[in-house]
Protein backbone atom coordinates (compact mmCIF):
# COMPACT_ATOMS: atom_id res chain seq x y z
CA UNK A 1 0.00 0.00 0.00
CA UNK A 2 1.21 3.51 -0.82
CA UNK A 3 0.27 5.73 2.11
CA UNK A 4 1.22 9.38 2.40
CA UNK A 5 4.42 8.97 0.46
CA UNK A 6 5.60 5.97 2.49
CA UNK A 7 5.51 2.31 1.50
CA UNK A 8 3.64 0.27 4.12
CA UNK A 9 3.30 -3.51 4.04
CA UNK A 10 1.37 -6.05 6.08
CA UNK A 11 4.57 -7.64 7.45
CA UNK A 12 3.33 -11.12 8.49
CA UNK A 13 1.53 -11.62 5.18
CA UNK A 14 4.45 -10.15 3.22
CA UNK A 15 7.03 -12.35 4.98
CA UNK A 16 5.01 -15.54 4.53
CA UNK A 17 4.45 -14.94 0.83
CA UNK A 18 8.06 -13.90 0.26
CA UNK A 19 9.52 -16.95 2.02
CA UNK A 20 7.22 -19.27 0.08
CA UNK A 21 8.11 -17.60 -3.22
CA UNK A 22 11.86 -17.68 -2.56
CA UNK A 23 11.74 -21.35 -1.62
CA UNK A 24 10.02 -22.14 -4.90
CA UNK A 25 12.30 -19.90 -6.96
CA UNK A 26 15.60 -18.94 -5.28
CA UNK A 27 16.73 -17.17 -8.48
CA UNK A 28 14.12 -14.51 -7.77
CA UNK A 29 16.48 -12.61 -5.45
CA UNK A 30 19.09 -12.33 -8.19
CA UNK A 31 16.45 -11.24 -10.73
CA UNK A 32 15.04 -8.59 -8.38
CA UNK A 33 18.49 -7.13 -7.70
CA UNK A 34 19.35 -7.20 -11.40
CA UNK A 35 16.03 -5.55 -12.31
CA UNK A 36 16.62 -2.81 -9.75
CA UNK A 37 19.95 -1.84 -11.31
CA UNK A 38 18.53 -2.15 -14.84
CA UNK A 39 15.74 0.30 -13.95
CA UNK A 40 18.20 2.58 -12.18
CA UNK A 41 20.63 2.62 -15.10
CA UNK A 42 17.92 3.45 -17.65
CA UNK A 43 16.14 5.94 -15.35
CA UNK A 44 12.82 4.14 -15.78
CA UNK A 45 11.95 3.46 -12.18
CA UNK A 46 9.86 4.95 -9.44
CA UNK A 47 10.70 4.36 -5.80
CA UNK A 48 8.33 1.48 -5.22
CA UNK A 49 7.53 0.16 -8.69
CA UNK A 50 9.83 -1.39 -11.26
CA UNK A 51 9.00 -0.54 -14.86
CA UNK A 52 11.22 -3.39 -16.05
CA UNK A 53 11.39 -6.81 -14.43
CA UNK A 54 14.09 -8.93 -16.05
CA UNK A 55 15.80 -12.27 -15.71
CA UNK A 56 19.48 -11.97 -14.88
CA UNK A 57 21.45 -11.51 -18.09
CA UNK A 58 18.66 -9.93 -20.14
CA UNK A 59 19.83 -6.70 -21.73
CA UNK A 60 18.59 -3.28 -22.79
CA UNK A 61 20.93 -1.22 -24.97
CA UNK A 62 20.05 2.32 -26.06
CA UNK A 63 21.82 4.56 -28.53
CA UNK A 64 21.95 8.34 -28.40
CA UNK A 65 18.47 9.88 -28.27
CA UNK A 66 16.67 6.51 -28.11
CA UNK A 67 13.57 6.50 -25.89
CA UNK A 68 12.11 3.55 -24.01
CA UNK A 69 8.59 4.51 -22.90
CA UNK A 70 6.89 2.08 -20.51
CA UNK A 71 3.33 2.86 -19.45
CA UNK A 72 3.12 0.01 -16.94
CA UNK A 73 5.67 -2.81 -17.02
CA UNK A 74 7.99 -4.69 -19.38
CA UNK A 75 8.92 -8.26 -18.46
CA UNK A 76 12.08 -9.76 -19.96
CA UNK A 77 12.53 -13.52 -19.68
CA UNK A 78 10.42 -15.91 -17.64
CA UNK A 79 9.54 -19.57 -18.17
CA UNK A 80 7.89 -20.69 -21.40
CA UNK A 81 7.37 -24.00 -23.22
CA UNK A 82 8.33 -26.09 -20.22
CA UNK A 83 11.44 -23.98 -19.55
CA UNK A 84 13.16 -25.42 -22.63
CA UNK A 85 14.61 -22.06 -23.72
CA UNK A 86 17.54 -20.75 -21.66
CA UNK A 87 18.88 -17.88 -23.78
CA UNK A 88 18.32 -14.32 -22.56
CA UNK A 89 16.00 -11.72 -24.04
CA UNK A 90 17.40 -8.45 -25.34
CA UNK A 91 16.25 -5.00 -26.44
CA UNK A 92 18.62 -3.03 -28.68
CA UNK A 93 17.64 0.51 -29.64
CA UNK A 94 19.64 2.53 -32.12
CA UNK A 95 19.86 6.31 -32.13
CA UNK A 96 16.65 8.38 -31.98
CA UNK A 97 14.41 5.29 -32.04
CA UNK A 98 11.36 4.77 -29.80
CA UNK A 99 10.05 1.60 -28.16
CA UNK A 100 6.65 2.27 -26.56
CA UNK A 101 5.35 -0.39 -24.16
CA UNK A 102 1.67 0.51 -23.89
CA UNK A 103 0.80 -1.42 -20.73
CA UNK A 104 2.05 -4.79 -19.48
CA UNK A 105 4.14 -6.59 -22.11
CA UNK A 106 6.04 -9.87 -21.73
CA UNK A 107 9.04 -10.81 -23.86
CA UNK A 108 10.05 -14.41 -23.26
CA UNK A 109 13.53 -15.95 -23.10
CA UNK A 110 15.56 -15.56 -26.27
CA UNK A 111 13.30 -12.82 -27.69
CA UNK A 112 15.23 -10.11 -29.52
CA UNK A 113 13.85 -6.62 -30.13
CA UNK A 114 15.75 -4.26 -32.43
CA UNK A 115 14.71 -0.71 -33.34
CA UNK A 116 16.78 0.89 -36.08
CA UNK A 117 17.80 4.56 -36.26
CA UNK A 118 14.69 6.77 -36.00
CA UNK A 119 12.32 3.77 -35.94
CA UNK A 120 9.12 3.51 -33.88
CA UNK A 121 7.93 0.24 -32.30
CA UNK A 122 4.83 0.04 -30.12
CA UNK A 123 3.35 -3.01 -28.37
CA UNK A 124 -0.06 -2.93 -26.70
CA UNK A 125 -1.20 -3.94 -23.22
CA UNK A 126 -1.36 -7.62 -22.26
CA UNK A 127 0.61 -8.79 -25.31
CA UNK A 128 3.25 -11.46 -24.99
CA UNK A 129 5.93 -12.93 -27.24
CA UNK A 130 6.89 -16.35 -25.94
CA UNK A 131 10.45 -17.39 -26.84
CA UNK A 132 13.24 -17.16 -29.43
CA UNK A 133 11.37 -14.66 -31.60
CA UNK A 134 12.71 -11.55 -33.34
CA UNK A 135 11.09 -8.17 -33.98
CA UNK A 136 13.25 -5.98 -36.22
CA UNK A 137 11.82 -2.49 -36.69
CA UNK A 138 13.58 -0.30 -39.25
CA UNK A 139 10.70 2.16 -39.67
CA UNK A 140 7.33 1.48 -37.99
CA UNK A 141 5.83 -1.63 -36.40
CA UNK A 142 2.64 -1.54 -34.34
CA UNK A 143 1.45 -4.58 -32.38
CA UNK A 144 -1.94 -4.25 -30.68
CA UNK A 145 -3.17 -5.29 -27.27
CA UNK A 146 -4.02 -8.83 -26.09
CA UNK A 147 -1.86 -10.47 -28.76
CA UNK A 148 -0.22 -13.89 -28.43
CA UNK A 149 2.92 -14.40 -30.51
CA UNK A 150 4.39 -17.89 -30.33
CA UNK A 151 8.01 -19.00 -30.40
CA UNK A 152 10.43 -18.67 -33.32
CA UNK A 153 8.37 -15.95 -34.97
CA UNK A 154 10.04 -13.19 -36.99
CA UNK A 155 8.45 -9.78 -37.65
CA UNK A 156 10.19 -7.43 -40.10
CA UNK A 157 9.33 -4.12 -41.76
CA UNK A 158 12.37 -4.12 -44.05
CA UNK A 159 14.03 -6.16 -46.81
CA UNK A 160 17.47 -5.13 -45.47
CA UNK A 161 18.89 -4.99 -49.03
CA UNK A 162 17.93 -3.16 -52.23
CA UNK A 163 16.94 -5.31 -55.21
CA UNK A 164 17.52 -3.74 -58.64
CA UNK A 165 15.36 -4.76 -61.62
CA UNK A 166 16.11 -4.62 -65.38
CA UNK A 167 13.72 -1.67 -65.86
CA UNK A 168 15.88 0.49 -63.55
CA UNK A 169 13.44 0.20 -60.64
CA UNK A 170 14.11 -1.29 -57.25
CA UNK A 171 12.21 -2.67 -54.31
CA UNK A 172 10.76 -0.39 -51.65
CA UNK A 173 13.12 -1.14 -48.80
CA UNK A 174 10.82 -0.50 -45.81
CA UNK A 175 7.05 -0.53 -45.27
CA UNK A 176 5.17 -0.32 -41.94
CA UNK A 177 3.71 -3.41 -40.28
CA UNK A 178 0.39 -3.19 -38.43
CA UNK A 179 -0.82 -6.05 -36.21
CA UNK A 180 -4.25 -5.46 -34.69
CA UNK A 181 -5.72 -6.28 -31.29
CA UNK A 182 -6.21 -9.85 -30.04
CA UNK A 183 -4.16 -11.49 -32.80
CA UNK A 184 -2.72 -14.98 -32.35
CA UNK A 185 0.39 -15.80 -34.37
CA UNK A 186 1.50 -19.44 -34.22
CA UNK A 187 5.05 -20.72 -33.95
CA UNK A 188 7.67 -20.46 -36.72
CA UNK A 189 5.83 -17.70 -38.60
CA UNK A 190 7.38 -14.83 -40.55
CA UNK A 191 5.60 -11.49 -40.96
CA UNK A 192 7.06 -9.40 -43.77
CA UNK A 193 7.09 -5.65 -44.45
CA UNK A 194 3.96 -3.78 -45.49
CA UNK A 195 1.54 -6.28 -43.93
CA UNK A 196 -1.61 -5.46 -41.96
CA UNK A 197 -3.15 -8.19 -39.80
CA UNK A 198 -6.69 -7.38 -38.71
CA UNK A 199 -8.14 -7.63 -35.21
CA UNK A 200 -8.88 -11.13 -33.85
CA UNK A 201 -7.06 -12.88 -36.70
CA UNK A 202 -5.30 -16.23 -36.24
CA UNK A 203 -2.10 -17.10 -38.12
CA UNK A 204 -1.33 -20.83 -38.26
CA UNK A 205 2.11 -22.26 -37.50
CA UNK A 206 4.82 -22.03 -40.19
CA UNK A 207 2.96 -19.34 -42.15
CA UNK A 208 4.71 -16.72 -44.30
CA UNK A 209 2.59 -13.58 -43.94
CA UNK A 210 3.40 -11.57 -47.07
CA UNK A 211 -0.01 -9.95 -47.63
CA UNK A 212 -2.81 -8.48 -45.56
CA UNK A 213 -5.00 -10.65 -43.34
CA UNK A 214 -8.61 -9.49 -42.77
CA UNK A 215 -10.05 -9.35 -39.24
CA UNK A 216 -11.47 -12.54 -37.70
CA UNK A 217 -9.82 -14.80 -40.27
CA UNK A 218 -7.66 -17.92 -40.03
CA UNK A 219 -4.68 -17.75 -42.40
CA UNK A 220 -2.14 -20.52 -42.99
CA UNK A 221 0.59 -21.73 -45.30
CA UNK A 222 3.33 -20.65 -47.68
CA UNK A 223 2.03 -19.13 -49.85
CA UNK A 224 -0.42 -17.83 -47.27
CA UNK A 225 -4.14 -18.26 -47.82
CA UNK A 226 -7.23 -17.51 -45.75
CA UNK A 227 -9.05 -20.77 -45.02
CA UNK A 228 -11.67 -19.63 -42.51
CA UNK A 229 -13.64 -16.45 -41.82
CA UNK A 230 -15.59 -15.21 -38.80
CA UNK A 231 -13.31 -17.07 -36.39
CA UNK A 232 -12.81 -16.32 -32.71
CA UNK A 233 -10.11 -17.48 -30.33
CA UNK A 234 -9.59 -17.40 -26.57
CA UNK A 235 -6.38 -17.23 -24.56
Task: Please report, for each region that a protein language model flagged, where it lies by residue.
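Flexible glycine-rich beta->alpha loop in the catalytic core of nucleotide-sugar glycosyltransferases
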Residues: 160-161, 207-208, 214
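Short, flexible, glycine-rich and Lys/Arg-enriched loop motifs at helix boundaries
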Residues: 83-88, 161-168
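Conserved catalytic-core motifs of eukaryotic protein kinase domains, centered on the activation segment
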Residues: 159, 166-167, 195, 229-231
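Domain-scale signature associated with acetyltransferase and cell-envelope carbohydrate enzymes
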Residues: 2-156, 180-181, 199, 215, ...
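Glycine-rich NAD(P)-binding loop of Rossmann-like domains
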Residues: 168-179
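Beta-rich strand-turn-strand
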Residues: 136-140, 188-201, 207-211
Amino acid sequence: MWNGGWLSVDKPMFNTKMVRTLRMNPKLILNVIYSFFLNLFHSIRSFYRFRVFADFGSTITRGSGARLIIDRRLYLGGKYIGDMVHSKSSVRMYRDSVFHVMGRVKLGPGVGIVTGPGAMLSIGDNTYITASSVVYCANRITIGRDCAIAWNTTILDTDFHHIHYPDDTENELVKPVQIGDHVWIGCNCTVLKGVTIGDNAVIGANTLVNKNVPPNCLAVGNPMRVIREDVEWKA
